Design a protein with these regions (language model features):
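Multi-pass membrane proteins that catalyze or facilitate reactions on polyprenyl-/lipid-phosphate substrates
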Residues: 1-170
């Protein structure tokens, strides 16, 4: 998580510029995601817990996943599994490690004035928050179940196909 904070704080403008329609970059990064997912799916299942040094390396993969086309959860789960960590713990850790980043970004945007609140939208915002929370819980539960069953190859194929299409049409 710490590497992602450093990259996000010091290179925010440069990262934002990468999201300006560079389809070739997105396609190439989708291929990287596909490779990571495929390798992780083939890794041996262990019962190893996430160590501090592994957490830092997983944080580096989370920072790299700020590039367009790299799945953050795919990169962190794959990195964790390739380091020998238990697949279920890897998936849970991946979803937990993004929470401080989300709250940190919200706090930064509020303090800088980039994010404001209009009390007239309270109901809409509340409904959106609840819907996002429920769908997020569902998605996390589903993804953890897929990781447990070693079904990441399906996502790898999807990322590979979409990546190739993006490269061909860029």
């Amino acid at each position: 998580m710490i590497p992602a904070v450093v990259i996000g704080v010091f290179f925010e403008k440069e990262l934002e510029q990468l999201f300006g329609g560079n389809i070739m970059l997105v396609g190439c990064m989708l291929l990287v995601t596909a490779l990571l997912l495929f390798l992780a799916d083939k890794a041996k299942d262990t019962q190893k817990k996430v160590s501090f040094s592994n957490a830092f390396i997983i944080g580096v993969s989370q920072a790299i996943a700020m590039l367009p086309g790299i799945s953050r959860s795919g990169a962190t789960i794959s990195t964790s599994v390739l380091l020998g960590n238990d697949k279920t713990k890897a998936a849970r850790f991946s979803f937990l490690m993004v929470v401080p980043l989300i709250f940190g970004k919200i706090a930064k945007d509020i303090l800088s004035g980039d994010l404001t609140y209009d009390s007239g939208n309270f109901t809409s915002l509340s409904i959106g928050f609840v819907a996002a929370f429920i769908s997020g819980l569902f998605a996390c539960t589903w993804m953890i179940a897929l990781v447990k069953k070693s079904k990441l190859t399906y996502f790898a194929i999807y990322c590979g196909v979409v990546g190739l299409i993006a490269i061909i049409f860029s």
